[in-house]
Amino acid sequence: MPLIDASAKIHPTALIEEGAKIGANVEIGAFCVIGKDVRIGAGTKIHSHVVIQGDTEIGEDNQIFQFASIGEINQDLKYQGEPTKTIIGHRNRIRESVTIHRGTVQGGGVTRVGNDNLFMINCHIAHDCSIGNRCIIANNGTLAGHVTLDDFVIVGGMSAIHQFVVVGSHVMLGGGSMVSQDVPPYIMAQGNHAQPFGVNLEGLKRRGFEKATMHAIRNVYKLIYRSGKTLEEAIPEIEQYAKTEAAVSLFLDFFKRSTRGIIR
């Protein structure tokens, strides 16, 4: 029998497979399917017609809307049914028809979503993606396998991000963007292929960044994109900014992780 907390509300048409664990005050709507290796944390609400499969852990106070599919077999042709996972944090809003696929052994075995994210209608999050906290992916946004979104990333509607791309914190990607290289933190980018269009100042203001910090970030942006210097030449100057403005260190950490080169 599934382990269902007494306070959970399960619609009689929902199918909860033996072995599933359902936490306190969880709501599961009509015609949902919850697989045997699924764990759902307290306070999460799952609307009708949602399918959750595989070794999937969902945290507390999430909302998952109609026709979403989470933890299903991924679309990597190399996948042979190996045991892999999907892990989702707390307070996420996963809207209608979103798909989040389980990981692959080649990619570390886990597709991971943090806390307080919003995935709008028809988004796709492929195998082995890692999404931080407070990200927004607008309608029909697509993340290919192994993509990393750091914190506070906004992906505009109809955008697609190539395999293995890393998108830094506080990035704003405009709608319809095709992203094939890594996107440094704090910047705005748009296009096919995506190009940088300045610093995401409005987003930084909303998150309480000080004027001096934003000024330093703008100076680093100019070093990277307008000075004519190579990235290797710019890094020593960026390191100097990081000594007085801790937020600038995100650039340095990002460059260490970047494997695809940055957008230009």
Curated annotation (Swiss-Prot):
Pathway: Glycolipid biosynthesis; lipid IV(A) biosynthesis; lipid IV(A) from (3R)-3-hydroxytetradecanoyl-[acyl-carrier-protein] and UDP-N-acetyl-alpha-D-glucosamine: step 1/6
Catalysed transformations (reactions): a (3R)-hydroxyacyl-[ACP] + UDP-N-acetyl-alpha-D-glucosamine = a UDP-3-O-[(3R)-3-hydroxyacyl]-N-acetyl-alpha-D-glucosamine + holo-[ACP]
Disulphides: none
InterPro entries linked to this entry: Acetyltransf_C (IPR029098), Acetyltransf_C_sf (IPR037157), Hexapep (IPR001451), Hexapep_transf_CS (IPR018357), Lipid_A_LpxA (IPR010137), Trimer_LpxA-like_sf (IPR011004)
EC number: 2.3.1.129
Gene3D superfamilies: Hexapeptide repeat proteins, Udp N-acetylglucosamine O-acyltransferase, C-terminal domain
Pfam families documented for this protein: Acetyltransf_11 (PF13720), Hexapep (PF00132)
Keywords for this protein: Acyltransferase, Cytoplasm, Lipid A biosynthesis, Lipid biosynthesis, Lipid metabolism, Repeat, Transferase
Gene Ontology annotations of biological process type: lipid A biosynthetic process
GO MF: acyl-[acyl-carrier-protein]-UDP-N-acetylglucosamine O-acyltransferase activity
Subcellular location(s) of the protein: Cytoplasm
One GO cellular component term noted in the UniProt record for this chain: membrane
Family to which this protein belongs: Belongs to the transferase hexapeptide repeat family. LpxA subfamily.
Oligomeric and partner information: Homotrimer.
Function, in words: Involved in the biosynthesis of lipid A, a phosphorylated glycolipid that anchors the lipopolysaccharide to the outer membrane of the cell.
Full protein name: Acyl-[acyl-carrier-protein]--UDP-N-acetylglucosamine O-acyltransferase
Lineage: Bacteria, Pseudomonadati, Pseudomonadota, Gammaproteobacteria, Pasteurellales
